[in-house]
From Swiss-Prot:
This is tRNA pseudouridine synthase B. The active site is at D39. The keyword Cytoplasm does not apply. Keywords: Isomerase, tRNA processing. Gene3D superfamilies: Pseudouridine synthase. It is an enzyme of class 5 (isomerase). It catalyses: uridine(55) in tRNA = pseudouridine(55) in tRNA. Belongs to the pseudouridine synthase TruB family. Type 1 subfamily. It comes from Rickettsia typhi (strain ATCC VR-144 / Wilmington). Transmembrane segments: none annotated.
Amino acid sequence: MSNYWLNFYKPKGISSAKLVNIVKKIIGKTKIGHAGTLDVEAEGILPLAVGEATKLIQLLIDAKKTYIFSVKFGAQTDNGDYTGKVIASKNYIPSQEEAYAVCSKFIGNIKQIPPMFSAIKVNGIRAYKLAREGKVVELKPRNVTIYDLKCLNFDKEKAIATYYTECSKGTYIRTLTEDLALSLQSLGFVIELRRTQVGIFKEENAIHIKASDAITKNFIDKKSIKIEAILDDILVLDATDDQAQKIKYGQKCVFDYEEDVNFLWVRYNGTLLAIGSLNKSCFNSLRVFNLL
C-alpha cells in the first residue's frame, strides 16, 4: 500500500474534491484525503495525504498557511468574492498609504465572523447551502491569528490592492478582506486568491495539473514525499522491539524520558510507528500506523 504526501497545486475552476478524484483515478484504490479545502475559484497549494498519511491530516489543517489575495475596493458582494452579487457600494477608495498602513491593525489575535458562503455546518447543513436558499444564518465569531499581513501592490486607478498574509487555521480571507476594507472606510471583495504554503508544503515545488497533462502513477510516485516529512521538527523517540509490540497492541509502554510531552512521535527501525503524548514517562498513543 502507498503511504505518502503529494504537494499539489489546485488550479482555478475545480473543487478540492475534484482534484482528489483525479488523483484517485491515477493511483488506484488507495485512501486519499486533502488538508484544507480551497474554494473552486481559488488556486494554490492543496496537500494530499495517501494511505496512512491520512492519519496525519489534522496536523496540516492546524498548520500555518500563507495566501496572496487581491482586493477590489468600492463594493461588497453577497459571497465575498467576484463571483457574487453586488449588495452594496461606496465611492470612497483608500489611498496607497492607507492601503499599506492598515495591515498593522490586523496582525495578532483577532475575531472573525465566518462568511455566509462557507462550509461551516449549521444544524448539520453547510452554511453555503442555506445561503443559496436565501436563508439568513447567524454565525458566531471565531478567534484566529494573523501572523503577518502586508500590502504588495496598490493600483489606485483600478481600486485594487494585493496583500500577503500568514495566518492560523480557520482564517477566512474573504472575511479578512471585508474587514480590512471597512477599516479603510470603504467596501471590498476578493478578486484573486492564491494559497502559497501549507505547513512544509510550498508552491515552488508543487505538482501542477492541467486537462492536457498525462500524469501517470510513476510520475506521482517520483513526486511523493515521505510520510514523516511533516514531523521533522517534532520530538521523536525510538522504540525497542518490546516497546513497539506494546504500542502496536495498545498496551502500557514506558520510555526512559522524564519530561511530559504534549505531542511526539515514535519510530521503530527508522519507520513511523505512532503519534501521541508522554505523561510521567508513559506513552499515550493517539494514532498507530500500519507501516511495518
